[in-house]
Amino acid sequence: MIKISIHFYFRVNITHGRPNPHLNPHLNSHLPQQRPSSPRLYETALQKVSQMGDAVSRSTRENYLTALRSLRRFAGENLCVGDVSQTLLHSYERWLTGQGISRNTSSCYMRSLRAVLGKLTGADTEPLFKGVYTGRCTTEKRAVGEETVRRLKGLKLSAHSPLALARDLFLFSFYAQGMPFVDMAFLRRQQIARGQLVYHRHKTGTRISVALQPCMQTIISRYQAEGDYVFPLLHTADAQAAYNEYLTQLNWYNRALKKLAQQAGIKENLTSYTARHSWATAAYHANVELPVISKALGHSNPQTTLTYLREIDDHRLEAANRRIINMV
């Protein structure tokens, strides 16, 4: 007689808090709800990032914080360090895609999370991120020519249409030397004074000053009664709530730009980055020196600016790159 033994192993999850109602149901079932030996990821990681100080650049810290906030929106406050698994990361990656986040941005989040988890645990986190995209893919052309900008500018729209706001934002970004959408969203009225618009880039903290042009003032004047923010995108002073609003508005903005392109008969793909890249390209064609373009964009390294201009088939790029290399 042959005896067969079957063993069942049960893992009991005891609630550490309430399951996140916004998380996919199957993920809630995977999250150990109480794990005293495993601290909560978000609050622990924030402490770790704040302790890094000058050991990492400001832009790197911002990347870490942005990725952590994004993961918190997906998985909630109660996610513990030990809860992060391949299953969760793959589901998070799919969620990012569903939110309209580009593959390169998703990859940036994943690389940041991998680095933070490695610093928190002291362990090799490479296996944990196996199968999750952490590379850098070549992006499609982001810049458009001056004729496309003029066509968008001349499009007939109702003054109170949401698309009119989207167009104003696109044009303002172009007029303000490629001002990023996130910085327009958080721009406050007190940052505009004595004919200057002054802001610090959210991504790097770089201070940028732009001379206020009449076309910029015209756009600003349309939203005078909307509150402390220059544009009617954010409606709270709470940092986390404002960030969540920003993400929602970013998704709206990208969708609105696609509608604007359709109405204007524009074949190029318009995104939140298009105006910024288009300004850089126009400045380059106007023979503005590369260091000046870099300063206007808030790039500390002109090499970063070259990535904006790489799509231009122009021998001057090669010469500019040689000059940059010879500087160091």
Feature locations, PLM:
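N-terminal DNA-binding recognition helix of tyrosine site-specific recombinases/integrases
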Residues: 70, 82-84, 98-129, 179
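Basic, Lys/Arg- and aromatic-enriched nucleic-acid-binding interface segment
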Residues: 132-181
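Short, basic (Lys/Arg/His-rich) helix/loop patches that form interaction surfaces
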Residues: 158-161, 254-295
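Active-site/catalytic core of tyrosine-dependent DNA strand-transfer enzymes
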Residues: 213-267
